[in-house]
Amino acid sequence: MMRKMIFIRAAAVCAVMALGFSVSCKKNAERTMVTFFMGTVEVLRNGASVKPAIKMEIQDGDVIAAGPESFILLQVAESMVIRITESSTVEMKSLLSPKNRELLVRRGKALSAVRKLGKDGAFTVKTATITASVRGTEFSVSSRPKESVVAVRKGTVEVTVIASGTGETVGEGKAFVYTDRAATRTVTAAEDRELEMIGAIPAIPGLGEKTEQEIRDIILPLLGDSGIAAMTLDEVKEKYRRTDTVILYDGRIITGVIISRGPVFAIMTAKGVVSVPEKKIRNTRVTPLQ
């Protein structure tokens, strides 16, 4: 009898733990977390400015502001990835409820790659003048003075003009532009590149269990040139297997790694990326890493 009672109690404890674990997993699965950021980014929460960090949880009502040459990546549950681009301000209206996820782009641009939303899931991105609703797609929504744009790379987006209530379905390769009237055009090459990049970034399974370095190692190689700017000098040296010495006409010497050439050279140094006009460069020397 005693053995039977112990078994029943143990079974009850296991059931409670399993239920708690299930609820915890469900709660964790709905979290929105920072997976990467670069430059000047701040999270405005309850009137205070909070510095972002990888694995930081984003809450409903938070406003994220990215400065020039800056951006931030968010992962919502395991269903979507969002990139808030430079010079943008985006409010997290409702991200914790899978049935009604919503962003408000106050200015700038938000790129979204929606993987899965579930049977009753919904995701909406708004500006002051339009609403874009999706179930699964790669798209961007931008807000500038007197203009809102929705660009679609994959899937379809239902766009509604708030003032008139009129709607339009925007398909792959198309962009909906609203000023004082609505128009449709082909997505630009720049828009397509942006969306291709956000589409390549995965929704990381078990994100909450990953270390910051593990997340960084997953995301960084997928960011292209913007990822290089976020790397340390040692990481860039390892990537390119060299050190560059740049000698200027005014006698200055810059040591680092040249990460792009053209009318203006971009050079990764110990203090970050510096830009130097080509006409100011006397010559360069390359030292391969051993």
Predicted regions and their residues:
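Flexible, surface-exposed loop/linker segments and immediately adjacent secondary-structure boundaries
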Residues: 25-63, 67-69, 74-242
